[in-house]
Curated annotation (Swiss-Prot):
Function: Part of the dynactin complex that activates the molecular motor dynein for ultra-processive transport along microtubules. Together with dynein is involved in spindle assembly and cytokinesis.
GO biological process, one term: cytoskeleton-dependent cytokinesis
Modification sites for N-acetylalanine: A2
Subunit structure: Subunit of dynactin, a multiprotein complex part of a tripartite complex with dynein and a adapter, such as BICDL1, BICD2 or HOOK3. The dynactin complex is built around ACTR1A/ACTB filament and consists of an actin-related filament composed of a shoulder domain, a pointed end and a barbed end. Its length is defined by its flexible shoulder domain. The soulder is composed of 2 DCTN1 subunits, 4 DCTN2 and 2 DCTN3. The 4 DCNT2 (via N-terminus) bind the ACTR1A filament and act as molecular rulers to determine the length. The pointed end is important for binding dynein-dynactin cargo adapters.
Major site of localization recorded for this protein: cytoplasm
Keywords: Acetylation, Cell cycle, Cell division, Centromere, Chromosome, Coiled coil, Cytoplasm, Cytoskeleton, Kinetochore, Mitosis
Lineage: Eukaryota, Metazoa, Chordata, Craniata, Vertebrata
Location(s) in or outside the cell: Cytoplasm; Cytoplasm, Cytoskeleton, Microtubule organizing center, Centrosome; Chromosome, Centromere, Kinetochore; Cytoplasm, Cytoskeleton, Spindle
Protein's name in the database: Dynactin subunit 3
Top-level taxon of the source organism: Eukaryota
Similarity comment: Belongs to the dynactin subunit 3 family.
Pfam families: Dynactin_p22
Amino acid sequence: MAGVTDVQRLQARLEELERWVYGPGGSRGSRKVADGLVKVQVALGNIASKRERVKILYKKIEDLIKYLDPEYMDRIAIPDASKLQFILAEEQFILSQVALLEQVEALVPMLDSAHIKAVPEHAARLQRLAQIHIQQQDQCVEITEESKALLEEYNKTTMLLSKQFVQWDELLCQLEAAKQVKPAEE
């Protein structure tokens, strides 16, 4: 009796699944799709049997899939002598990598130091300092531009004063020359 109810529950679940997949109309044409796929496969087989090149390609596809398999190299048996030659050829590289690995292992305790663990705190402080530095750079640029403007004004003023003093000097020289000429005439 329990087996019958299990079968009925399974049947109900399958019907619900079919409604989800195929919609409320039921399994419309599920056999037609399968039949269509079989027909396509038979048609491809007939076409392939008529053409020699296609037959050869179908045979080569299997080989290609086999060669593209990443485990294919693992299946090929490499003699121990060849493996030894590979290892001996890379001996210096392996030794240098071992030395580097030993250095890394020696430096591992440094990674557990309080300085490294405090990096997040320092990063936040560094970010704030970087922002302050950028603001100060902007202020420095503004001050530099203002200083340049003031120096240009100073240079213009100095140049005008210099020209004015030269003109006054020339005028004074002319007046002194005219004054010296008058007493000589009397």
